[in-house]
Amino acid sequence: MKCVILAAGYAVRMYPLTCNYPKSLLVVDRKPILSHLVESVREFVSDITVVTNHKFHEVLSIWSRNYPEVSLVDDKTTCDAGRLGALVDLSLAIQPGSDYIVMASDNYLDFPLDSFIRYYQEVQTSCVMYHEIEDPDRLRRTAVISVSDSVVTSFTEKPECPCSTLAVPPFYIYTADDCAKLSDVISSGCNLDNLGSFAEWLHSRSTIHAFKMPGTCIDISDLYC
């Protein structure tokens, strides 16, 4: 298994805090959130790729000196208006023939990822994590799923009318066969900015299992804004 962490966004909603500093390096629990993510997964994967934009490539290069297992991919963008979108950024890092754990770089987990990875190893399909949220406003800002026998039966990114209280944060595991479908997703006309658009497209074409999170996921913007 390999890992991709997406850190190429510009976090304009958090300006001026993130105008000249990457959101992924904001500190939670005494260290950058990106450090938490790398440390939670590195013993389970053979390779970790962080996709960054060109504007923050240098500062992330400095950060990565403490993590020799991490390689950076520069998507060459320099501003929010020129961003490629999460799915295109993901395609820059995905290599054929490997399964991947894929994460956004702006969510903090208060539990280790080993249980999620072990679940994937048991079911041998692509997987998402979920937790329960009762607040309809929060549900409209995330991905929401329905589940039957632990299999995803519906998946909607940022639904106007949420079909359940099962919210999916941006942590996914994709099989090698499903990773090979990423180019089809990109050409399908889906919203390239939403990392969850891949799973949303995929769930009706491939089996995706849902893993109930054993802890909490916190969007870093909720801590700083």
What are these regions (language model features)?
Residues G9, D106, E132, D222:
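Active-site glycine-centered loops adjacent to acidic/histidine catalytic or metal-binding residues
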Residues Y100, Y108, V144, P170-F171, ...:
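A residue-level structural signature of the nucleotidyltransferase/glycosyltransferase Rossmann-like core
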Residues V128-P162:
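Anionic-ligand binding region
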Residues C19-K23:
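Short alpha-helical oligomerization interface
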Residues K2-I5, R13, V27, K31-Y108, ...:
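Conserved N-terminal catalytic core of the sugar/cofactor nucleotidyltransferase
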Residues I117-Q121, V151-C225:
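Catalytic-core segments of class I nucleotidyltransferases/pyrophosphorylases
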Residues F111-L139:
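Conserved donor-nucleotide/metal-binding helix-loop-beta segment in metal-dependent transferases, i.e.
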Residues L25, V144-V147, A210:
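A structural signal for short hydrophobic beta-strand segments in well-ordered beta-sheet cores
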